[in-house]
């Protein structure tokens, strides 16, 4: 459902002159009217012409096109964001296909690696371990009192790039930009946070420009006590906030999620968001290929927290479709660097133990090896779906893909590792190795593949199809928690917007131009499920839709009226 056009009320603000021009949330630049220029002491501080936001956006687009590298484009857009946020979001929404890969993956990876080098202006909150005793004061320094969404990272596992220290701040900034651009959440309600607990990246420690705490990472009790101090301070300052954990290392991600998901409204996008968008994609792809997800056999390469999170959500979805838990688990095979996870494998992580296959059930497999490789698994399982979350490039070899295609006429192949340099196989190769028969969705953006004069659009299995809608749904409904059922309702809603399912052609996932419409639909489904689950106050469907409309921010200038502080 499209947002209703609503007349914006005037905004009463106390700032004036250069202070107002330096306030990104309020600055209009050349779009200040003559009356506003007189009332806010701006006469002579701006060129004579009063422009519309579209005229400003057109100039910015021309300037943007003058930059030749993606990182330079990223720096330029971040500069606009730190100068005039309304213009930034109008520009991004006008060119979302072009700019989403620049403000987020894959370009944000390079921006994180070079964070201290390209740093220009502070955005968000940096909380170092050295300042742990000032936690409450730090959060009180945030000028926005009505924060509704926080994205926090400790920078230890940034995309597939590893420990980037405070450079990881680029991820919360980029993620929250998508909450606004795709989900309509006002930038005034968002706060990026990095927990600076040191870094084990020697290159950063040796870099004279590095701006973070030059110390090896704290671990164990020190680490968890520090994170807990942060959580308690957030609860004190903004008790109803939605907190998203982002790019925490595998050893910490699941423990933190399990510890806090029932204490504060929170989720981990790497685990739950990735799982939700993947399951939504698989529901749609399964329908397009014929049948339900519960009928498919699935092999994973990568059994970390993200891979296991996806697997558990697939199992939950196939149970919804009628399988018993035992039958659902027998259809999912997890492969990591030591081979297939089985009940005979030592040193399994806690979240892996429920995803093992019984070794005794594999006695008739065609292999002589004790370590069951990905090729062994594909040859014997004959999967319908192959998912890569390994973070290692090239592991979906031609032999493996062709072996899969032997037994599956319409294979679903999803190399999800980020950034592009870490992808398990390129869509071009997968399409060629399957004679054009594979359904492909990737974690990073790829151009359409041309094979034998036919164009194959490649869907990006992008979490941005999920988390902005979840955030909007939580805010609109006032949900106090994010339940598994809320995430699954988001997946099902996403699948309903698949062009391939709706039209029999096109991508598995919607086009980016439709992402706000999809986010609004997901917000409604999530809010409705929150009410059914008892984590939000029950209202009518009309009231929930109205709350979504009321909370959906548009990149438009409002009239200003002056008031005193």
From Swiss-Prot:
Q: Where does a divalent metal cation bind?
A: 246-247, 270
In chain numbering, the residues marked as site (Important for activity) are 270
Identify the keywords attached in UniProt to this record, alphabetized: Metal-binding, NAD, Oxidoreductase
Its EC number(s)? 1.1.1.38
Gene3D superfamilies for this protein: Malic enzyme, N-terminal domain, NAD(P)-binding Rossmann-like Domain
Kindly state which reaction or reactions the protein catalyses: (S)-malate + NAD(+) = pyruvate + CO2 + NADH; oxaloacetate + H(+) = pyruvate + CO2
Q: Which cofactor does it need?
A: Mg(2+); Mn(2+)
Q: Name one GO molecular function term.
A: NAD binding
Catalytic machinery residues? 104, 175
Q: Which residues bind NAD(+)?
A: 157, 270, 418
EC top class, as a word? oxidoreductase
The record describes how the cofactor is bound as: Divalent metal cations. Prefers magnesium or manganese.
Q: What is the superkingdom listed in this entry's lineage?
A: Bacteria
Q: Name one GO biological process term.
A: malate metabolic process
Gene Ontology CC, one term: cytosol
How does the annotation summarize its subunit structure? Answer: Homotetramer.
Stated family: Belongs to the malic enzymes family.
Q: Which NCBIfam families does this UniProt record tie to the protein?
A: PRK13529.1
Q: What is this protein called?
A: NAD-dependent malic enzyme
Source organism (scientific name): Escherichia coli O9:H4 (strain HS)
Q: Which gene encodes it?
A: maeA
